[in-house]
């Protein structure tokens, strides 16, 4: 039986609570959270510097010492109709979902080794690996996608198609809880979090 950590929550450098990503402020406002901005973390950069391209999700977090969260944020508000955005959104979101799935895959691949060489967040990454290996625990993957949308109905239909695509691409993860939400709905799936547009 693996012992949960009790000492690292208060002094880990992972214990910051306020992050900005794509013009959105994420406030993880409970001591139950331990979160890192993984795409900027040394653990990810060590791999991505050595091997391009290696991708990462925006946030990697543990809630209440027992639930692992991978969160990717895409804010296309004001840019939904740009050529570059349209390219990513085409084919019913196929390319966007592929990119998000790759970030999930690469994050899990790099995080497995992080516990070996991460000096400042070793306990954090060790706990993440324990959670990854515990098949009683679901890995929560949240894609937070913000768009300029014509109608609510169209938006819901699109999200449901995207969700199926993302689930297919991450089916190998087995016990994963996958959701795609706009900002306004994100607190329903991300506990103890306050999210605001900057």
Task: Please place each PLM-identified region on the residue numbering.
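Short amphipathic alpha-helices and their capping/turn segments at secondary-structure boundaries
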Residues: 58-64, 131
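Residue-level detector of short, conserved catalytic/binding motifs and their immediate flanks
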Residues: 55-57, 69, 139
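Short Lys/Arg-rich amphipathic alpha-helical segments
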Residues: 53-56, 93, 101-104, 151-154
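Conserved catalytic cores of phosphodiester-cleaving nucleases, focusing on short active-site segments
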Residues: 59-61, 69-75
């Amino acid at each position: 039986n693996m012992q949960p950590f009790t000492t690292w929550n208060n002094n880990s450098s992972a214990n910051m609570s306020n992050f900005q990503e794509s013009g959105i402020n994420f406030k993880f406002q409970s001591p139950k959270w331990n979160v890192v901005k993984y795409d900027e973390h040394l653990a990810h950069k060590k791999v991505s510097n050595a091997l391009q391209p290696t991708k990462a999700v925006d946030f990697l977090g543990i809630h209440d010492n027992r639930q692992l969260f991978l969160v990717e944020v895409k804010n296309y508000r004001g840019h939904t109709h740009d050529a570059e955005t349209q390219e990513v959104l085409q084919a019913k979101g196929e390319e966007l979902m592929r990119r998000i799935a790759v970030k999930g895959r690469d994050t899990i691949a790099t995080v497995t080794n992080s516990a070996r060489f991460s000096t400042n967040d070793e306990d954090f990454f060790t706990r993440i690996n324990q959670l990854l290996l515990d098949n009683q625990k679901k890995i929560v993957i949240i894609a937070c996608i913000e768009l300029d949308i014509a109608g609510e109905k169209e938006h819901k239909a699109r999200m449901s198609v995207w969700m199926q695509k993302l689930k297919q691409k991450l089916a190998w993860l087995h016990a994963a809880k996958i959701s795609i939400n706009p900002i306004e709905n994100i607190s329903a799936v991300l506990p103890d979090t306050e999210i605001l547009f900057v």
